[in-house]
Amino acid sequence: MKRFYGGLLVVSMCMFLTVYRYVDLNTPVEKPYITAAASVVVTPNTTLPMEWLRITLPDFMKEARNTQEAISGDDIAVVSGLFVEQNVSKEEREPLLTWNRLESLVDNAQSLVNGVDAIKEAGIVWESLVSAVEAKKLVDVNENQTRKGKEELCPQFLSKMNATEADGSSLKLQIPCGLTQGSSITVIGIPDGLVGSFRIDLTGQPLPGEPDPPIIVHYNVRLLGDKSTEDPVIVQNSWTASQDWGAEERCPKFDPDMNKKVDDLDECNKMVGGEINRTSSTSLQSNTSRGVPVAREASKHEKYFPFKQGFLSVATLRVGTEGMQMTVDGKHITSFAFRDTLEPWLVSEIRITGDFRLISILASGLPTSEESEHVVDLEALKSPTLSPLRPLDLVIGVFSTANNFKRRMAVRRTWMQYDDVRSGRVAVRFFVGLHKSPLVNLELWNEARTYGDVQLMPFVDYYSLISWKTLAICIFGTEVDSAKFIMKTDDDAFVRVDEVLLSLSMTNNTRGLIYGLINSDSQPIRNPDSKWYISYEEWPEEKYPPWAHGPGYIVSRDIAESVGKLFKEGNLKMFKLEDVAMGIWIAELTKHGLEPHYENDGRIISDGCKDGYVVAHYQSPAEMTCLWRKYQETKRSLCCREW
């Protein structure tokens, strides 16, 4: 992240000049994208492969269980639609092989934060996706060809110029497919008006029944101060209808010692609010040695603030790993950690209000998929057909979110090209929840059909629900396919598949195996401000059982099978930290006779890359490509330090 900011001023000015060069200043410009497809409702027709043939009610409707607290009567019909049996083609069935096996999640959705909302929202967007897919098929059949000149569903960038609303009160820029790590929003304008204060809000989509959308990031610039100070201040916050405003984060801070780090950068740059010296020529005096008049410099003390009334500012909000970074005129100013359940993929609109004369706004690095007809190496990227007669040595489940198109393509072009993967000895699947945006879901569906390596989850993706994906990987590796070992990793991790297989063979253990970077002495984080905060209600004990770090760990088939069995019996304790959850599940299985064998491997790097790695985490698509090139050239695990 730090390397990015050194050149940000140059990048910002290039953006400014580029926008002025190519965009008519009098015409708001926005790259077109389709919005109608997902709203089309098609009358069911039994000749269509996605038609619903038979409704199978989930267990919570059949049995007198106390689950109405989780799913209300009004939502039962919507949720039941998730698990309708469908007559689909083999190609369309492939992404849904794990789907119905997770139906029992509905019974205990309330056990995790956002669980109930994730399933209810999934019911709504799934119905919309089915309608959109059927509508597209009708169009293709009627025209007998794919529509030429297809507009992008998820554009890579969007821009507007001088685009305030008619009443001059605000600007709104739609973000159809959310934000992802590396996305940035550059705002060029001038604080003006009587007050010169303004706000930038990144909002999501309102939940059904809620008139106002959640505010994922609220960036409030108060040039004349507020009730707490007369000096200019930046206030960062978030808002939801259920929780109202969160705790304010101010810059400059009242207490500089409370300046925490987000992505290794200060929440508030210490220079904001600090004194700066400026000199001015106030009078002339004679140089006593030469008799020459010279300017006498008088010192003026001012406090630094990045925005100034009447002066042009170039401000950029950039999505990092942990939060949002704000730079102004090339200087890092603030960082804002994403609040619990408010994640960047939820952003659907940017709103700018107040005394701010907008010159331009540019959203770039947006998540977008590659159109299959433009992918030169398409066949080499498709998942190989797996033979039911040949058991797999390893299933690798990759956590990914719906709009992380670029990360998935990077994985397909790099370590998924290992011979062991292409030959069918190892199967790799992305486990992806639904998105709240119909456009993203349609892109995801097309991607899943094209490459055959995506497993869709029957819930909307929230970070608090990732242990549901861990469960899904266990089910896929034992019930959908049959593998000796099951591995979990992330879409920003580079995996040396050959080294993993070699290490597993050297353990000479196929039962009770937990292989990874083992943590045998860790405690729950009790700080509510932490992303990994765990309350005493969630975990009352002082320590966790042994667990393996999430970027890359492996369990043997018997453990994965037992996890699936606990789930079917309703005895699987859900825990929001998925890697710790696996450790908790194994500890529970130990009480019932499992003899665990922990294999620690320090070559699994959970916080970046080190030479000799087996798994390297936090790698961008460009870094993944570089690591693959290094491996092909040297057959060694060498990091790309130049990136």
From Swiss-Prot:
It is an enzyme of class 2 (transferase). Residues 171-364 form the Galectin domain. SMART domains: Gal-bind_lectin. Pathway: Protein modification; protein glycosylation. GO terms for molecular function: carbohydrate binding; UDP-galactose:N-glycan beta-1,3-galactosyltransferase activity. Residues 1-6 are cytoplasmic. The keyword Glycoprotein applies. Residues 24-643 are lumenal. Glycans are attached at N45, N87, N144, N162, N277, N287, N508. Its EC number is 2.4.1.-. Expressed in stems and siliques. Interacts with GMII. This is Beta-1,3-galactosyltransferase GALT1. It comes from Arabidopsis thaliana (Mouse-ear cress). The lineage of its organism: Eukaryota, Viridiplantae, Streptophyta, Embryophyta, Tracheophyta. The gene is GALT1.
